[in-house]
């Protein structure tokens, strides 16, 4: 019950930032229609085709939420000195992280649902089993990614530095994903083996499977993140300077 109450508080705080909310929702939606504008008439009402096209965009939206609505919020609350006032033991740390994870997971569901709804409306297509599975898969992938990447919120850096790191990371992932459409060899191939956006896209498409390298890499990240959550520092960086 306490977890749910805190999750609702954190969720309401995220909703109260309208510019970030609108930008996260609208930017990939506008980009999708920009890239597929000439195909609206050709694939009018084609839900099966849309299901294959939206996986990468769902991955981008979801990974953005993981980085900026989850990891960055954890860093921001730590650096504001907010959690140091009431989190003094492991139970408190886990309660805080768990509540933020639930709030961010709800936000990711809203983002993905809105994006898919707008795309289906634009193409006058009806949702089918494939679309429902994409939404359900995105939920459990988001939950896993948030848990696996929790260690990124434990870096002892300032909020601004963390924001810069996350921005660079999502840009690299986005660019490598786009480049792989034309060239997927060498370093581009290896980056995409651990690229969260590419992993989302792979899992959301039922005819593709993850490589052993990807599974091994994220298993290690999961273990590191569990340790990071248990030892999460609540004191802001500036307090020790």
UniProtKB/Swiss-Prot annotation:
<feature type="transmembrane region" description="Helical">
    <location>
        <begin position="131"/>
        <end position="149"/>
    </location>
</feature>
<comment type="function">
    <text>Together with two further proteins McbF and McbG this protein causes immunity to the peptide antibiotic microcin B17 (MccB17), which inhibits DNA replication in enterobacteriaceae. Immunity is determined by two different mechanisms. McbE is involved in the production of extracellular MccB17 and, in a complex with McbF it also serves as 'pump' for the export of active MccB17 from the cytoplasm to the periplasmic space.</text>
</comment>
<protein>
    <recommendedName>
        <fullName>Protein McbE</fullName>
    </recommendedName>
</protein>
<feature type="transmembrane region" description="Helical">
    <location>
        <begin position="105"/>
        <end position="123"/>
    </location>
</feature>
<keyword id="KW-0813">Transport</keyword>
<keyword id="KW-0614">Plasmid</keyword>
<feature type="transmembrane region" description="Helical">
    <location>
        <begin position="212"/>
        <end position="230"/>
    </location>
</feature>
<feature type="transmembrane region" description="Helical">
    <location>
        <begin position="163"/>
        <end position="181"/>
    </location>
</feature>
<keyword id="KW-1003">Cell membrane</keyword>
<keyword id="KW-1133">Transmembrane helix</keyword>
<keyword id="KW-0812">Transmembrane</keyword>
<feature type="transmembrane region" description="Helical">
    <location>
        <begin position="17"/>
        <end position="35"/>
    </location>
</feature>
<dbReference type="GO" id="GO:0046677">
    <property type="term" value="P:response to antibiotic"/>
</dbReference>
<feature type="transmembrane region" description="Helical">
    <location>
        <begin position="54"/>
        <end position="72"/>
    </location>
</feature>
<dbReference type="GO" id="GO:0005886">
    <property type="term" value="C:plasma membrane"/>
</dbReference>
<keyword id="KW-0046">Antibiotic resistance</keyword>
<keyword id="KW-0472">Membrane</keyword>
